């Protein structure tokens, strides 16, 4: 017991500690479930492509689009033409009238053969037009699933005709007609009519082919324009273009484009063609799809589409196509590493370093900017 228990003490108010409760800290707890769901990839592009392929394999869709529009994919025979040349209607005034009458039966025969082959499998989607009586309404067209099925049927028919060697000449004749139309459009004088240039056209074609022997008089009619196509040299005396001394050399670099595309398509296996068909139907060029398939190998459709989508995103940033393909191949198809490599490569190229040296240094140092820059500066000194 203490002696000071009963003694009152006076304490100043400054020493008195208040007993008011302090407010707790405001903590904002994020919605972890929503964050995780938002960061997950939904694979919408892959699911859409697989759904289209499965629906096209099962049969035509009973649903139809209510909005009138154009088809989502071009005809299959246009895929064999090089994407560097635009398509336009072939001029009819350049050709000789007699030669045009001779060529028309062959084209009609080819069209009948294509129509008969298409009718054996299934009617093509182009036959169901809005104005035809088979369509349910005047303002309705088939949906993209039916268009994809028609494209696959056309691709199958094209592969069959390519194996027989019948389809290669059609894009080639179309390209020759387009080049003749471009040659006439370069002339500044509109007074010269294209009909006056057609009769003397076949005259310089015979000395342009020295390897072929002269035809005897009993050999029959001259074959149509598949063998003797109008070239720029045949129009040179009547246009503003300079005459060519020998064979039509400007056509040689461009003549191999449809042949190369046809050869690549016919050289693919059935598994590779099944991968390329839906990809081409989505709008990717045939040539780029074949090159991407050769680089990535036989993978699933989702991996193939992810590679093409990554390349397209890098191309939209302004990089060259060859450099994008090389970067994706160097970093094992990783879009993030390839994008970082392209960004650093562009920065170091603007500084004046050698491009081959930049690629080597970035590949050795794994896209580490500081170390790569130090080595480039040391090599330059």
Swiss-Prot record:
A matching Pfam family: UBAP-1_UBA2
Compositional bias ranges of the Pro residues kind: 197-216
Basic and acidic residues: bias regions: 95-104
GO molecular function, one term: ubiquitin binding
Region described as Disordered: spans on this chain: 87-141, 185-228
GO cellular component: ESCRT I complex
One BP term from GO: ubiquitin-dependent protein catabolic process via the multivesicular body sorting pathway
PROSITE patterns given in the database record: UMA (PS51497)
Chain intervals with Acidic residues compositional bias: 105-123
Ranges annotated as biased composition (Low complexity): 124-141
Gene3D superfamilies hit by this protein: UBAP1 SOUBA domain
UMA domain: residues covered: 4-50
Listed PANTHER family: LD44032P, UBIQUITIN-ASSOCIATED PROTEIN 1-LIKE
Name by which UniProt lists this protein: Ubiquitin-associated protein 1-like
């Amino acid at each position: 017991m203490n002696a000071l228990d009963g003694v009152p003490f006076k304490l100043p108010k400054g020493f008195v500690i208040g007993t008011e409760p302090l407010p707790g800290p405001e903590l904002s707890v994020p919605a972890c479930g929503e964050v995780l769901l938002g960061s997950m990839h939904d694979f919408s592009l892959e699911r859409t492509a697989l759904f289209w392929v499965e629906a096209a394999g099962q049969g035509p869709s009973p649903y139809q689009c209510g909005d009138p529009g154009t088809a989502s994919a071009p005809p299959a025979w246009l895929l064999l033409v090089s994407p560097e040349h635009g398509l336009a209607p072939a001029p009819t005034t350049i050709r000789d009238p007699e030669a045009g009458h001779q060529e028309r039966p062959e084209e009609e025969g080819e069209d009948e053969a294509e129509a008969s082959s298409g009718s054996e499998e299934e009617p093509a989607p182009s036959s169901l037009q809005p104005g035809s009586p088979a369509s349910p309404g005047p303002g309705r067209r088939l949906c993209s699933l039916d268009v994809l099925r028609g494209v696959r049927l056309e691709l199958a028919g094209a592969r069959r005709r390519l194996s027989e060697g019948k389809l290669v000449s059609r894009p080639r004749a179309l390209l020759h007609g387009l080049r003749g139309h471009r040659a006439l459009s370069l002339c500044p004088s509109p007074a010269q009519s294209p009909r006056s240039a057609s009769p003397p056209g076949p005259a310089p074609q015979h000395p342009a082919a020295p390897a072929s022997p002269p035809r005897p008089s009993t050999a029959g009619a001259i074959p149509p324009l598949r063998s003797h196509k109008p070239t720029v040299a045949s129009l040179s005396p009547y246009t503003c273009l300079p005459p060519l001394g020998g064979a039509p050399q400007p056509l040689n670099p461009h003549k191999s484009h449809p042949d190369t595309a046809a050869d690549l398509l016919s050289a693919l296996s059935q598994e590779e063609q099944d991968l390329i068909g839906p990809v081409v139907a989505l709008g990717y060029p045939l040539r780029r799809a074949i090159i991407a398939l050769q680089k990535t190998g036989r993978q699933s459709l989702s991996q193939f589409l992810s590679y093409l989508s990554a390349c397209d995103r890098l191309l939209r940033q302004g990089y060259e196509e060859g450099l994008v393909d090389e970067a994706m191949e160097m970093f094992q198809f990783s879009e993030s590493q390839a994008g970082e490599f392209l960004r650093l490569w562009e920065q170091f190229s603007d500084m004046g370093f050698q491009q081959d040296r930049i690629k080597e240094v970035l590949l050795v140092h794994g896209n580490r900017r500081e170390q790569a820059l130090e080595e480039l500066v040391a090599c330059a000194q």
